[in-house]
Amino acid sequence: MRTPLLAGNWKMYKTTGEARELVEGLLHGLGDVSDRKVLVCPPFTALHTVRDLVQGTPIALGAQDVYIEPQGAFTGAISPVMLRDLGCTYVIVGHSERRAIFGEGDELIGKKVRAALAHDLTPILCVGETKPQRDAGEAETIVVAQVRAALAGMTPDQIARIVIAYEPVWAIGTGDTATPADAQAMHVTIRQTLGELAGSDVADAINILYGGSVKPDNIDDLMAQPDIDGALVGGASLKADSFLRIVHFLPIQG
């Protein structure tokens, strides 16, 4: 059985003081989460503050991006070595905002996945289609191509250490959400693709998260789907009460 992962992507929000307040609120209401994993991904500037707060708690620490080199003359970049030094165990790679705003392509994203793995970080590889691509009937083709491009040449053992997040671009921050059935169908397609790349045993063990306007009022229906193994949460992770409701989704799969 795959252990659900509920991940909060804070994007470019929260000063260090605001981050402290949010984490304290999360810890106050967290309770028993032994049957699921909880992750927060603050901006780089808040990682140190959040690390000190979540050490020894069930909340894991992740980053929102990483560069492909361990060190060097790469002004403004953050290396996987630095993230590990700060206590990160996860890193988001290939988020649609990185693809669209910063021009990141599949080749660079694949290198970031490898860099994360090489330094014992679990990459959360984000894939997803735009609204025009979905309307044109190309959603599955686009998503499968993104998965294959990012994981090209990797061994089954490497692929087994990756988390996938399906985030339909048209649903991110818009209030629109893929229906649970549509999300489930895409997750099945992704899992089938992983099976072709790494074998069914590996594919069956990989967490595939849904991301795209995940909210307290839709998390239960999403998590009831057999191939949705958690959520990558944006706006709803910025307030303790809403993220806690998502973390405490019901019912647990079993």
UniProtKB/Swiss-Prot annotation:
<dbReference type="GO" id="GO:0019563">
    <property type="term" value="P:glycerol catabolic process"/>
</dbReference>
<feature type="binding site">
    <location>
        <position position="213"/>
    </location>
    <ligand>
        <name>substrate</name>
    </ligand>
</feature>
<keyword id="KW-0324">Glycolysis</keyword>
<keyword id="KW-0413">Isomerase</keyword>
<dbReference type="InterPro" id="IPR022896">
    <property type="entry name" value="TrioseP_Isoase_bac/euk"/>
</dbReference>
<comment type="similarity">
    <text>Belongs to the triosephosphate isomerase family.</text>
</comment>
<comment type="pathway">
    <text>Carbohydrate biosynthesis; gluconeogenesis.</text>
</comment>
<comment type="subunit">
    <text>Homodimer.</text>
</comment>
<dbReference type="Pfam" id="PF00121">
    <property type="entry name" value="TIM"/>
</dbReference>
<feature type="binding site">
    <location>
        <position position="173"/>
    </location>
    <ligand>
        <name>substrate</name>
    </ligand>
</feature>
<dbReference type="InterPro" id="IPR035990">
    <property type="entry name" value="TIM_sf"/>
</dbReference>
<feature type="active site" description="Proton acceptor">
    <location>
        <position position="167"/>
    </location>
</feature>
<dbReference type="InterPro" id="IPR020861">
    <property type="entry name" value="Triosephosphate_isomerase_AS"/>
</dbReference>
<dbReference type="GO" id="GO:0004807">
    <property type="term" value="F:triose-phosphate isomerase activity"/>
</dbReference>
<protein>
    <recommendedName>
        <fullName>Triosephosphate isomerase</fullName>
        <ecNumber>5.3.1.1</ecNumber>
    </recommendedName>
</protein>
<comment type="pathway">
    <text>Carbohydrate degradation; glycolysis; D-glyceraldehyde 3-phosphate from glycerone phosphate: step 1/1.</text>
</comment>
<feature type="binding site">
    <location>
        <begin position="9"/>
        <end position="11"/>
    </location>
    <ligand>
        <name>substrate</name>
    </ligand>
</feature>
<dbReference type="GO" id="GO:0046166">
    <property type="term" value="P:glyceraldehyde-3-phosphate biosynthetic process"/>
</dbReference>
<dbReference type="GO" id="GO:0005829">
    <property type="term" value="C:cytosol"/>
</dbReference>
<dbReference type="InterPro" id="IPR013785">
    <property type="entry name" value="Aldolase_TIM"/>
</dbReference>
<dbReference type="GO" id="GO:0006096">
    <property type="term" value="P:glycolytic process"/>
</dbReference>
<comment type="function">
    <text>Involved in the gluconeogenesis. Catalyzes stereospecifically the conversion of dihydroxyacetone phosphate (DHAP) to D-glyceraldehyde-3-phosphate (G3P).</text>
</comment>
<keyword id="KW-0963">Cytoplasm</keyword>
<feature type="binding site">
    <location>
        <begin position="234"/>
        <end position="235"/>
    </location>
    <ligand>
        <name>substrate</name>
    </ligand>
</feature>
<feature type="active site" description="Electrophile">
    <location>
        <position position="95"/>
    </location>
</feature>
<keyword id="KW-0312">Gluconeogenesis</keyword>
<dbReference type="GO" id="GO:0006094">
    <property type="term" value="P:gluconeogenesis"/>
</dbReference>
<dbReference type="InterPro" id="IPR000652">
    <property type="entry name" value="Triosephosphate_isomerase"/>
</dbReference>
